[in-house]
């Protein structure tokens, strides 16, 4: 009922709404969160406690996850969502299968790019078989740390995703080893992750979406370059929920910009476990 309420409120104003589905953080989970080692693709060290080894998912675990993705997609469909996004980003569990730095498996889910992508493509197929909604895949194309996946290496992966039936890609950069790119600050500059779009455009024919410190001006430039089809804002809508209405009514000067301090949004949720706010509103 709560999901339906959100969807109906969104549709009431003529907007579309997408449901993001995730199977969790994997090795990025806090070790004390569940009282046992986190799951991952392999027995890699926990991000926040390297002395603790993760528990590799069994094939039975993987089958259960596929069923849960399908069931979640059905819930999203019944609630009225217009699309589904798979969270394969930021070094979370799906990414831990896709990336050789974390995936050390020797079965059909490890080794070659095709095998490492099997977990992700089976998720896509599970959702596609369950519902007739567009499927978006969120992926960081450049991990930005020495052992991580590079932009060039990611091109084969997005080609595999397109062949698997993904309808659009939500792309940027970073992972928890480069957490400054997960919550990009002002120091990283405007549109700090749009550079991944140009190369991706050469390898896929599906729509490309991009986020990361965008301003209205940088968003327009990226769209006009044709390297991306959609530009996304997150924290900007916390700073000024009326951003789009102001832009559409030619009142750009009235937009309250996000200053990317992370103090009252990310800081409240991650650091203080309280409801988010915005320093721009204080």
Residue ranges of model-derived segments:
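Flavin-dependent oxidoreductase catalytic cores
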Residues: 1-282
């Amino acid at each position: 009922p709560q999901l339906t309420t959100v969807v109906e409120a969104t549709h009431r104003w003529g907007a579309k709404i997408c449901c993001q589905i995730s199977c969790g953080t994997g090795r990025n989970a806090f070790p004390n969160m569940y009282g046992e080692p986190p799951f991952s693709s392999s027995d890699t060290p926990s991000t926040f406690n390297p002395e603790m080894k993760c528990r590799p998912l069994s094939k039975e675990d993987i089958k259960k996850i596929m069923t849960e993705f399908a069931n979640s997609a059905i819930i999203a469909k019944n609630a009225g969502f217009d699309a589904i996004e798979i969270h394969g980003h930021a070094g979370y569990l799906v990414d831990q299968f896709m990336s050789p730095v974390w995936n050390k498996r020797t079965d059909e889910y490890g080794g070659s790019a095709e095998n490492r992508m099997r977990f992700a493509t089976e998720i896509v197929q599970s959702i596609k078989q369950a519902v007739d909604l567009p499927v978006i895949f969120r992926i960081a194309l450049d991990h930005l740390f020495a052992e991580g996946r590079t932009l060039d290496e990611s091109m084969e992966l997005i080609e595999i995703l397109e062949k698997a039936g993904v309808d659009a890609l939500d792309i940027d950069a970073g992972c928890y080893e480069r957490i400054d790119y997960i919550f990009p600050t002002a120091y990283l500059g405007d549109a700090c992750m749009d550079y991944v779009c140009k190369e991706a455009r050469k390898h896929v024919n599906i729509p490309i979406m991009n986020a990361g410190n965008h301003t209205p001006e940088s968003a327009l430039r990226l769209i006009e370059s044709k390297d991306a089809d959609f530009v996304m804002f997150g924290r900007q809508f916390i700073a000024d929920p009326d951003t789009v209405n102001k832009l559409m009514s030619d009142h750009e000067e009235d937009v309250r910009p996000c200053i990317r301090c992370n103090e009252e949004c990310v800081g409240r949720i991650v650091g203080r476990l309280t409801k988010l706010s915005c320093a721009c509103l204080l």
